[in-house]
Amino acid sequence: LEKKKDLCQEPDENPLIKKYGAKLGRLIQIIRSLLVNEENKIIVFSQWDNMLSLIGKSLAENGIDNSFIKGNVHARNSAISKFRFGIDTKGNNVKNNVIMLSLKNAASGTTLTEATHIFFVEPINQIKAECIAIEHQAIGRACRIGQTKELTVMRLLCKDTIEEEIYNRLNTS
């Protein structure tokens, strides 16, 4: 965690960072490197649907197929099927190793034990007990009966920003 904590602040000539900004550019870079191994499956959590939409669009622009669990039951089941089984609603094979979920409404009740990596895009700005509960619920989508792979959890924070202040407040009290 500490190693990943200041990723957004590192000086870099990476064109992704120039185009998308530090956090989103670095997230795309990390996801790309993880997907070199086709067995890796990634869950991205955010508190805001707009952020997840932006991430999804940016990943797609960079050739990374992804799904966003939102909408009606059919849309949600379609996104889950693509991620878990690599099959769309018409039975076609698809390559979709990234799924995005809102921490507000999509984390509970969803089983995603195929995941190998989880990203929290920003710290949760709530009281500590609530943050712990929300994170445990989110991680529990992948870390449950049926999980056979090692699961890595990463938090993306930008150094010297309100994000770092929130993270420090939650982890020092």
Residue spans for each PLM region:
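Acidic beta-strand-to-loop metal/phosphate-binding motif
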Residues: M100-L101, F120
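Short, low-complexity, polar/charged sequence segments that are solvent-exposed and flexible
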Residues: N62-D65, F85-T89, I118-V121, R141-R144, ...
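A conserved SF2-helicase RecA2
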Residues: I127-S173
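Conserved beta-strand elements of beta-rich interaction domains across eukaryotes
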Residues: D49-N50, V73, N105-A107, H117, ...
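A short beta-strand element within the Helicase C-terminal
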Residues: T110-P123, E150-L156
